[in-house]
Amino acid sequence: SEGVVVIPVYDEPATLTETLERLPAGLLTVLVINAPPGAEGRNAALFQALDVRPADGVFNVRHIAGPVLVVNRSTTPLPPRQGVGLARKIGADIALRLMADHVLPVTWIHSTDADVTLPPDYALAAPAVDDGVAALVYPFEHVAPNGLGDAMARYEIALHHYVLGLALAGSGYAHHTIG
């Protein structure tokens, strides 16, 4: 495998297929399908859109060129208020175990969101970084749906303002967070 990407997914069939189709073919994709308590049925359309079904003990997933690991945490819901963060951690823990067991010969775990629109030339390669660097945040831009441009601009300014404020204060945590 050329790498691994973890994608937490909840009730996002429309945008997820576009994201998956832009991932490199040699990439292991870990989909952690999750739902909060009481919303377990919300992923039915997602499973249908991906055409997730067992075949000889292995799941086939439409729209993904490379190997895929589907972790279904929607039938056993995640605890309240831990959804996307815990789903991302579950996927990263699985990838880390595969790396530690030398099943997955890569050095980086990438993560994105199911509702992200990736650029057409998107590639997840091991970045060239200085020793001691353990995490990177890729440049991002939020594209607002019609009528929400001002709200999205304020949201993105708030994200950057938070990080810049931490940097100005000399904090070692001056980086964007992910859910």
Language-model regions, residue ranges each:
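Active-site-proximal specificity loops/subdomain of glycosyltransferases
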Residues: E40-V106
